[in-house]
Each structure stands twice: as C-alpha cells, then as structure tokens.
C-alpha cells in the first residue's frame, strides 16, 4: 500500500538511465519498435532483452513510437483523474525503506484507526465535484488477516463510492481469494498492489514481504475479476536495468494490469531511503523513458503518474502525456505526501488540450495501422 507514496526532491544526479546504443542494438530496437507500433493487440510474451532494447532506444525515437502506440489504442486527449485517501494511516509492520507509515521508523506519522464511512463519503463527494472519476482508498497494514470487521467497513465504503458514479480502488496489502470475493461483491473496480521494482533489486528495499508474496496477491486479484492496478517506484537507488526488470514483470503477467502507476520517490525523513536518496533525484528522462516503454509493451493499459508528480515541471508532465501517460493522481494529498491540486490540474489539462476521462467509459480503440 505504501508503495503508492513515492518521489524525490533535491539536486539532480547525472543521468544513469541513458546511453548511446551500438548500431546493431539500434537496428534491433528499430525493428522491434516498428513491429510494436503495428501490433493489433497486447502481447504477454516479451523477453527481457526486447524490453531492454525498447527502453534504450534514443529518447525522441522512443517517444515517437510510444505516442504512435498510444494514439492507436487510446483517445490521446483523455486523462483519468484519480484521488487517493488514506483510510488507515501509520503503524504498518512492514519494513519498506521508503515508507512514512512503517512502525519501524521515526517519521512523525502516528498510527491511527480506520476512518468512518461518513468521512470517506465526504471526501469522495469532494473528489467527484472537482472532476475526479476514480476514488482510491489506502490502508497502512501488511494484510487483511483477522480484519473481518474492517473488511466489512471497507466493503461499505466501496458500495457508497460506486453509488456516486465513481470508480473505486483500494490498496490494503496482501489479500486472499475469499477477501477478494467480498470486495468484488461490493462492486470494487480495481485493487492496487505494486511490485515496486525489479525482482533482483526488491530485497534491497523490503524484507518483510517477498516478491512472490506480491505476485500471489496480484494473482488473487486477477482471479477474482477485479481489475489489477500494479506499478512501481523510481528513485530507490536502482539501475536502468531494474526499470527494465520491473516492466518485464508486469508485461509478462497472464494479462496486463488494467493500470500501472509510476511513482517518483519522495524521500521521507526518518526512513532509510530518506537519508540515502534525499540529495539524489531520479532524472526526469528515466521517468519518461520508463513511461514510454510501459506504453509500448502494455499498449491497452492505463499508465498513471502517481506520487512525486508535483516535483515535475509542467512541460515534463506534458512530455509524459505525449509519451502515453493517461492518468494522474490529483487532490489534496497522496496518503502522507504532497499532491498537485484539482485547480492546478484542471488548468494543466485545459492548457494542453486534454480532458478528464469519464468513469467506466475509457476509450480503448481497436487499432488499425495508421500510415
């Protein structure tokens, strides 16, 4: 859950994300990009080498092809506006090195009880009034074991949000098949459970929950019929190869996630990564390159700029939209971190000729090759 809280703020380190490929690698990536741009449907048989070749394409070529794919599979003027509310803050037993809500670190975040349904309804109404069409609810705990009363309360929250005409999403840690059935019966639209980073780098960030634990939860969500929302965090100290590995995990699932949030680490004082990464900001080209590659290898998926977007210049955000990003988080806060406000984002969309995506009405094209 805390995976949604992420992003950087300080001096920018020299970019490690890009390099100039050898001519043979360029030829291979050009052929792969051309084939991907002409694809009629998503594929789940990507190799890690293929994704690496796409990721390492010269950046402007990469954006050109990702924009082409985006326009073939989506209405490029539509951007989904999502709002995230913390319904249970702090006190999490996990040791995620980036998270303000871990009980293992002194971050100033106090453990709180789950909020009342009425508070959620009020926040959802405000989000809808400001143009948001997906309302997300996050709880800071490891899993849903022994939380039957909380699950009933959250199911009621989901029902109330749905009745407003909003899409509903929750992020509650690990869930089993029976818990997912209850959420599905309540009408849940999507469940967020991030993989965070590559399988190889993951143990450097989290030790209390395995990578396979995360994949099992995602499988439980997928099997329930609820849409999968799963993404990661950039700026944890990983390498470009870990960006490739993170995308490889998502792009080779039995079916692609319905949405992929891309977070930019927000270093939190008191966390291990707050100290390590405070002076090192993941370069923007790495964020853009990851988003563009995600669009190409998961063409029908919603690609969402999540935590840390407030650190990006307006023109950088516009480049992300051009590259295939078609969702953002907006509102007062993202769990415990800053968030771009509704008024600011309405003006952003107006200025760049974009419009909010309607609830339950996402435009997914049946692509035809455009010459």
Give the residues covered by each predicted segment.
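Hydrophobic faces of well-ordered beta-strands that scaffold small-molecule active sites
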Residues: 79-84, 135-137, 168-170, 191-193, ...
């Amino acid at each position: 859950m805390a995976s949604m809280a992420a992003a950087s703020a300080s001096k920018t380190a020299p970019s490690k994300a890009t390099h100039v490929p050898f001519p043979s690698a360029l030829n291979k990536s050009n052929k792969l990009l051309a084939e991907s741009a002409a694809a009629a449907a998503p594929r789940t048989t990507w190799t890690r080498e293929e994704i690496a070749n796409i990721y390492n394409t010269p950046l402007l070529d990469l954006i050109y092809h990702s924009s082409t794919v985006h326009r073939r599979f989506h209405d490029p003027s539509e951007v989904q506006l999502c709002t995230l509310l913390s319904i249970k803050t702090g006190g999490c037993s996990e040791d995620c090195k980036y998270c303000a809500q871990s009980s293992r670190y002194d971050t100033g975040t106090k453990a709180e009880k789950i909020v009342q349904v009425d508070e959620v309804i009020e926040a959802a109404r405000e989000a809808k009034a400001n143009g948001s069409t997906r309302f997300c609810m996050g709880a800071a705990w490891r899993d849903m074991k022994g939380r039957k009363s909380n699950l009933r309360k959250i199911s009621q929250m989901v029902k109330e949000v749905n009745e407003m005409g909003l899409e509903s999403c929750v992020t509650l840690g690990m869930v089993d098949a029976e818990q997912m059935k209850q959420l599905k019966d309540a009408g849940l639209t999507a469940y967020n459970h991030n993989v965070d980073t590559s399988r190889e780098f993951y143990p450097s960030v989290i030790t209390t929950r395995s990578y396979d634990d995360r994949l099992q939860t995602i499988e439980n969500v997928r099997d329930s019929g609820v849409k999968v929302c799963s993404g990661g965090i950039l700026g944890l100290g990983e390498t470009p190869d870990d960006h490739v590995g993170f995308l490889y995990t998502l792009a080779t699932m039995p079916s692609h996630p319905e949405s992929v949030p891309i977070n930019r680490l927000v270093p939190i004082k008191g966390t291990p990564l707050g100290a390590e990464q405070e002076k090192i900001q993941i370069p923007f080209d790495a964020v853009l390159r990851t988003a563009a590659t995600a669009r190409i290898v998961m063409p029908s998926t919603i690609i969402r700029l999540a935590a840390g977007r407030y650190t990006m210049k307006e023109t950088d955000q516009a480049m992300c939209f051009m590259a295939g990003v078609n969702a953002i988080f907006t509102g007062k806060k993202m769990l415990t971190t800053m968030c771009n406000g509704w008024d600011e984002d309405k003006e952003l969309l107006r200025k760049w000729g974009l419009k909010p995506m309607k609830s339950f009405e996402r435009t997914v094209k049946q692509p035809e090759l455009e010459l």
